[in-house]
Amino acid sequence: MQRSRAGADEAALLLAGLALRELEPGCGSPGRGRRGPRPGPGDEAAPALGRRGKGSGGPEAGADGLSRGERGPRRAAVPELSAQPAGSPRASLAGSDGGGGGGSARSSGISLGYDQRHGSPRSGRSDPRPGPGPPSVGSARSSVSSLGSRGSAGAYADFLPPGACPAPARSPEPAGPAPFPLPALPLPPGREGGPSAAERRLEALTRELERALEARTARDYFGICIKCGLGIYGAQQACQAMGSLYHTDCFTCDSCGRRLRGKAFYNVGEKVYCQEDFLYSGFQQTADKCSVCGHLIMEMILQALGKSYHPGCFRCSVCNECLDGVPFTVDVENNIYCVRDYHTVFAPKCASCARPILPAQGCETTIRVVSMDRDYHVACYHCEDCGLQLSGEEGRRCYPLAGHLLCRRCHLRRLQPGPLPSPTVHVTEL
């Protein structure tokens, strides 16, 4: 293919040089051009390059260094049509009817040449069969210039003599079939009908993902970091210490910058330190003392009631149970009790059974009955004679007499004259 194209280029340059040489001043027949060699039987038809035309001829330097001679008085013959694509940037002048009358053979020579910067849909190929003539110049790149070139009649319409108008352009002959059929590429669908189904599906998935991310963000929100003031999202980023929330990266040692999440730390002067920095930097001199044993608290510290304790020293004063993380209470003398022992010691005593009135199992509220300025269990509030359970209902109300709990019937019986009934004896198991 490259050899065929090079041969076509050489033939085109040779024909152009011959045409320009005939137009030089002093030529024997200035109005006639030499006929180029005929193409081979299998080659494509090449445009006639040795044309003659009218017009004033002046010396003009061309691309090949030749000067144009005076044009002959006779009109050049109409060149043969070239079977070249009309849309090529270097299409042949054979597609114009006025190529021989108003054109210039000089401009034809200028337009010849092979330009490697532009591609051509068809390339000049030599017939593998031997022929008498040179290779055919069938490439659109090696043909003469198109209508917009310097040699066309339309390009020199302003320089034509008065009354002369260029002949109308003639449509080129239909080109033959391309040697290499081009595949038909499917064009993308138009946008007149809106987005495609795939685009709508992608948009729906994007909205669904955004909603899922918003729901997850709202679910994993813990609060505001007290140090940086930003929101805390995710359990791995949250840290709670000293009654406040921190980011894991914000709750660090003020000395070495180590993260303190899940580690022992010490709060000294509103600054937190890890255990190593606290022990080996002299801060232990300002460490708190335990309110129970009086020793320095060098490890975990438990603060309650405005005092500091070792976790092992914070115990109930009755049962000696460790109260670290367990509900507790204190008396007026700041003695520490668990809830059970506190009610045992300080709960009111029942006037009937003399036992403390304690809350029920799993309940923190104490229920008691107060009658005649005395406290009773609910189960102990009954008639002392017949054992009827007393309450505020009609027929079960209490009618006390001489400090005894009586129902109405037993109360009236005791008011009748006669010997008083023997008091009821209640046996209580200890």
Swiss-Prot record:
GO BP: cell projection organization; cytoskeleton organization; miRNA-mediated gene silencing by inhibition of translation; miRNA-mediated post-transcriptional gene silencing; negative regulation of hippo signaling; regulation of cell morphogenesis; regulation of DNA-templated transcription; response to hypoxia
Assigned GO CC terms: adherens junction; nucleus; P-body; transcription regulator complex
Organism for this UniProt entry: Homo sapiens
One MF term in the entry's GO annotations: transcription corepressor activity
LIM zinc-binding domain location: 223-284, 288-348, 349-417
Biased composition (Low complexity): 136-149
Disordered as annotated region, ranges: 22-149, 164-198
Biased composition (Pro residues): 164-189
Gene3D superfamilies, per the entry: Cysteine Rich Protein (2.10.110.10)
Quaternary structure (record): Forms homodimers. Interacts with CD2AP and WT1. Interacts (via LIM domains) with SNAI1 (via SNAG domain), SNAI2/SLUG (via SNAG domain) and SCRT1 (via SNAG domain). Interacts with EIF4E, AGO1, AGO2, DCP2, DDX6, LATS1, LATS2, SAV1, EGLN2/PHD1 and EGLN3/PHD3. Interacts (via LIM domains) with isoform 1 and isoform 3 of VHL. Interacts with ROR2. Following treatment with bacterial lipopolysaccharide (LPS), forms a complex with MAPK8IP3 and dynein intermediate chain. Interacts with PRICKLE3.
Similarity remark: Belongs to the zyxin/ajuba family.
Keyword Chloroplast recorded: no
Protein keywords: Cell junction, Cilium biogenesis/degradation, Cytoplasm, LIM domain, Metal-binding, Nucleus, Repeat, Repressor, RNA-mediated gene silencing, Transcription, Transcription regulation, Zinc
Organism lineage string: Eukaryota, Metazoa, Chordata, Craniata, Vertebrata
Subcellular location: Cell junction, Adherens junction; Nucleus; Cytoplasm, P-body
Function: Adapter or scaffold protein which participates in the assembly of numerous protein complexes and is involved in several cellular processes such as cell fate determination, cytoskeletal organization, repression of gene transcription, cell-cell adhesion, cell differentiation, proliferation and migration. Positively regulates microRNA (miRNA)-mediated gene silencing. Negatively regulates Hippo signaling pathway and antagonizes phosphorylation of YAP1. Acts as a transcriptional corepressor for SNAI1 and SNAI2/SLUG-dependent repression of E-cadherin transcription.
Name by which UniProt lists this protein: Wilms tumor protein 1-interacting protein
Record-linked PROSITE patterns: LIM_DOMAIN_1, LIM_DOMAIN_2
